[in-house]
């Protein structure tokens, strides 16, 4: 059964907070310990306890790491994963998280991936947090992970390298492209481990996704927040609601008054080739009464940077506006049906519990041309084939 999990990071995110939340949502401690035993790290011992913060019950996770620990490099950690008895999927996901932290630390400290030594990532508690969270996804059979935007604090903290600003430089590197917002707190809210888990494992960011809720879990952090709010992370686990699909998109806009609109079809072609979800051009009246156009491009998070470059290259725009929005779409698929003119490609959407056939313009245009028929007649015949359940 497909399952979805939403991370509600109202007070930030760390590895131990995520791990505690998954345990509170139903992961058995014994099952998690059995999975971590596959790492063959004898000193790794989990300590869990139920705590209360602002009247809310949560699970706090600690790793018994009283023994002196050696600093580890990324190759050391990857070797531990490869020599473990973990499933290949858990190994791959954990490796992505460790590599995300290593890449950020190497960038910040001006060294290579192989040479960077981890003061945090090489410790047993961080290894347990990373591998433990990935194991929890497997144990709960979660295949979709959605996360709220992350809060970013201000101020300074002390670390092994000295006094550094918040957000920590490594966190800033890891969270490139991840939605976030500023808060007035002068305490660390997003740790490098938490940031890397989110960056490597989360598939989408935004509001609470449609789901049939099965469980809620709270994981506790290690500090008390100065503003009095609970230092907790909340997760929701459920089954996806197939009625609506929700995702975060980036809306890119620019106003143009000196651009030749004859180039618009070519621009659309380039934008769609590079992943644009939609492109539109609307007439507007600009300053001094000039007629102009507002070009709007809707993009997925992973394609937005390249699409912005294309707009600046192919138009006379001197700048762009962009913002994050959310969109809901009906579930849809492409299929082939039998028509009076042979097999035709159409769209099928789920609308109000019914399946509805929508004609494809290019297919209808092809048939109209081949059979010398009015385009609207072909459209009407295909729409007449609609069936409802």
UniProtKB/Swiss-Prot annotation:
InterPro entries: Ni_insertion
Alphabetized UniProt keyword annotations: Nickel
Source domain of life: Bacteria
Example of a GO MF term: lyase activity
NCBIfam families (alphabetical): nickel pincer cofactor biosynthesis protein LarC
Family: Belongs to the LarC family.
Protein name: Putative nickel insertion protein
Taxonomic source organism: Desulfotalea psychrophila (strain LSv54 / DSM 12343)
Lineage: Bacteria, Pseudomonadati, Thermodesulfobacteriota, Desulfobulbia, Desulfobulbales
């Amino acid at each position: 059964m497909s399952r979805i999990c939403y991370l509600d990071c109202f007070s930030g995110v760390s590895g131990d907070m995520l791990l505690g939340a998954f345990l509170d949502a139903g992961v058995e401690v014994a099952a998690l310990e059995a999975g971590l035993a596959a790492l063959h790290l004898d000193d790794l011992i989990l300590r869990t306890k139920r705590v209360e913060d602002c009247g809310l019950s949560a699970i706090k996770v600690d790793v018994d790491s009283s023994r002196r620990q050696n600093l580890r490099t990324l190759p050391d950690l990857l070797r531990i994963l490869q020599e473990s008895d973990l499933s290949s999927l858990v190994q791959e996901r954990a490796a992505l998280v460790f590599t995300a932290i290593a890449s950020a630390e190497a960038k910040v400290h001006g060294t290579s991936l192989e040479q960077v030594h981890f003061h945090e990532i090489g410790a047993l508690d961080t290894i347990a947090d990373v591998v433990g969270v990935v194991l929890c996804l497997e144990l709960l059979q979660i295949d979709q992970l959605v996360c709220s935007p992350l809060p970013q604090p201000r101020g300074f903290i002390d670390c092994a390298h000295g006094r550094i600003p918040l957000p920590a430089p490594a966190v800033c590197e890891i969270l490139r492209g991840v939605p976030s917002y500023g808060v007035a707190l002068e305490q660390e809210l997003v740790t490098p481990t938490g940031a890397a888990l989110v960056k490597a494992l989360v598939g989408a960011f935004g509001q609470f996704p449609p789901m049939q809720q099965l469980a809620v879990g709270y994981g506790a952090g290690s500090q008390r927040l100065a503003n009095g709010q609970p230092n907790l992370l909340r997760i929701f686990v459920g089954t996806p609601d197939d009625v609506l699909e929700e995702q975060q998109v980036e809306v890119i806009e620019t106003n143009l008054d000196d651009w030749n609109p004859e180039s618009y079809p070519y621009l659309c072609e380039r934008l769609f080739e590079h992943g644009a979800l939609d492109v539109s051009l609307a007439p507007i009246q600009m300053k001094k009464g000039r007629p102009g156009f507002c070009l709007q491009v809707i993009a997925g998070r992973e394609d937005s940077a390249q699409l912005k470059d294309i707009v600046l290259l192919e138009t006379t725009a001197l700048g762009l506006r962009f913002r994050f929005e959310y969109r809901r779409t009906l579930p849809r698929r492409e299929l082939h049906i039998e028509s009076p003119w042979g097999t035709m490609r159409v769209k099928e959407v789920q609308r109000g519990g019914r399946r509805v056939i929508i004609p494809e313009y290019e297919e209808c245009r092809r048939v109209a041309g081949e059979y010398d028929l009015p385009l609207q007649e072909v459209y009407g015949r295909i729409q007449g084939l609609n069936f409802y359940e």
